[in-house]
């Protein structure tokens, strides 16, 4: 009976971590900060064309949000001295800044990602 309980707990742990990973993969993260003009432009663009997507805006000046940004920078091997906002994470891709090229990248990645609320 003890082994059955241990096995069930192991399976439950695996299932819960799989759920947590999939929910994280269903979000687009936009790291921004107050006063960032490019962040505002990115926000307005996403609100207009991608409002059905699960986009989470994260202000890097609040709480420990900067640590989350650093975690993604490390994951994508982005040097700290070249970080800026907006920094957008879409699945296994990231975008730094916001201009014509970044809009094209965002559109391409968003179509691949297809995460809706």
PLM regions: where:
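Structural micro-motif
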Residues: 70-91, 99
């Amino acid at each position: 009976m003890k082994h059955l309980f241990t096995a069930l707990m192991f399976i439950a742990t695996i299932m819960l971590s799989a759920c947590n990973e999939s929910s994280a993969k269903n979000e687009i993260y936009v790291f921004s900060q107050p006063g960032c003009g490019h962040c505002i432009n990115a926000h307005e663009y996403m609100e207009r064309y991608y409002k059905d997507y699960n986009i989470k805006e994260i202000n890097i000046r609040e709480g420990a949000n900067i640590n989350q940004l650093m975690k993604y920078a490390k994951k994508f091997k982005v040097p700290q001295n070249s970080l800026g906002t907006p920094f957008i994470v879409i699945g296994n891709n990231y975008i730094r800044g916001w201009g014509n090229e970044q809009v094209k990248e965002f559109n391409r990645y968003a179509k691949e990602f297809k995460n809706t609320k």
